[in-house]
Each structure stands twice: as structure tokens, then as C-alpha cells.
Amino acid sequence: MLGNMMDSPLLISGLIEHAASSHPTSEIVSRRCETDSKGESIHRYTMRDAAKRSKKIANALIKMGANPADRIATLAWNNYRHFELYFGVSGIGSVLHTINPRLFPEQLVYIINHAEDRWIFVDLTFVPLLEAIQEQISSVEGFIIMADSANMPDTSLKNAICYEDLIDNASDELEWPHFDENSAASLCYTSGTTGNPKGVLYSHRSTLLHAMSEVSREALGITSLSCILPVVPMFHVNAWGVPYAGAMTGAKLVFPGPG
């Protein structure tokens, strides 16, 4: 005999939905690579805003032809756009591949090709890295530059798209799909092993269980009253799961940005 209480899969999309409904006004502060019209690099918004923009990026990816299990990469710092991608990519069943920009160029080529990434979201800082290797990464169909139109660089990257333009044209209405909670949610490659970097896949279930453990009093004790600055890079073991824990509890998140 099986119990059926709360018989629903543990999915990452559930975290951002919970954040939007239970902690809508919790603040997310982020330092950007670019500045706004006033010369400010600090960006502020709420969990509700992040949830809407996550749905926008999800809808944009679906329109671009993203499928479940497709690998979609990021080459980015800890910032609010990267946070949106944590949910927008994995939420539709695609796999978020967070790339460590501190790897050697030949290692970047190896892991992008090995993962067979279809698109790469890239912060302004790392555009030159990709320009130098773009002819060697055959699976990549295009690059989404994480900036607004006013700060788009003059780049040789083929099929370069502005992040803000992409989501401006997308709807924030989306019913997140349900699928097996053991499906891959994110992909990280090792950076300190012998030979080529090794890929490690995290499931939706493992990610949520890790976040649940992390917020406990016996671990980090994260609550809605907490203010957290994730120093661990979002390309390193998913910043130790802190972005997910922030969404789970409604803690204030402060992303340090480039550097």
C-alpha cells in the first residue's frame, strides 16, 4: 500500500513559484557588469519580479526550440540574470550548464563540446573568451549576451542576442511543465582533476533536498529574516545551493557581480 499525500515531483520550478507566492517582496540586490542611464551598477528587485522574468526567459527558450534535456550554458558572474536562468532553464526541463570561466581555453572548448551546449548565456566580461574559441565549439547555435540594448558590445560572436530584448518580447505567463524529479537539472564540470574536466549532473530532486538541508538550523540556518551574499561562484557547485535556499526561504539575496 502506498501513500499519496502531496504526490507531486520535487522540481526547481516549484521553488521560484513558492518564492513568488510566499515571499513576493523579498529583495534581490545585484551588482551588474554594466551601468544604467544614471551610471549606477546596482540593480534591485523582488522575488516576484525574478519569478516573472524566469518565466519570460523560459518562454523565450521554448520559442527558440529548447527541448527537455538540452544543455544550455552560462558563462556569468553571480547576478540577478544568472539567478533567473537557474529557474528559467531547468524549469522547462532543459539542463543548466554553468561554465567556470577560470578554466583554460582548451578546457572550455572541451566541456562545451562534450556537453553539446546549444546556447550560451554570457556576461559582458566573458564575451572575448567566447570570441576566441567560437570556431571550435560546433554545437552552439547562438549566444545571449547578458546586458540591455544600450550596453550591447560590438562583438564577432555569431547569432548574438541581447538578453533584455529577448525577454522583453516574451510572455510572463507560463504553467511550468511537470516531469520526473530525477531528471537532470544542472551540469557542472570539475576544475581540479587530472585529465579533462568531468561532468556531474544534478537532479531536480537532489537540488531541492540539498536546499532543504541547507536551510535547517543544523546547517546554515537560513530564514526569511536572513540576508545572504553568495561569494561562492554560481558556476561552482551551483554556489553551494544558496540561490535555491534563498528562493525556498525568501531570504534577501545580495549578488556581488563581477570580480
PLM features per residue range, with description:
Residues M6, P24-E27, I144, D168-Y189, ...:
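Conserved pre-ATP/AMP-binding loop-to-beta segment of ANL
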Residues D7-C33, K52:
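A short N-terminal helical cap/helix-turn-helix that marks the beginning
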Residues L15-E17, K63-M64, G91-D165, F179:
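Structural core segment of the AMP-binding/adenylate-forming
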Residues I28-N79, F83-F87, F104-V109, C162-D165:
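Conserved AMP-binding/adenylate-forming core of the ANL superfamily
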Residues R44-R48, A185-M212:
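Conserved AMP-binding A3 loop
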Residues A50-I57, D168-N169, V200-T223, F235:
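Conserved structural elements of the adenylate-forming
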Residues R71, W77-H97, P101-P105, N113-W119, ...:
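A short helix-loop-beta submotif of the ANL/AMP-binding
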Residues L208-C227, F235-G259:
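Conserved AMP-binding/adenylation subdomain of ANL enzymes
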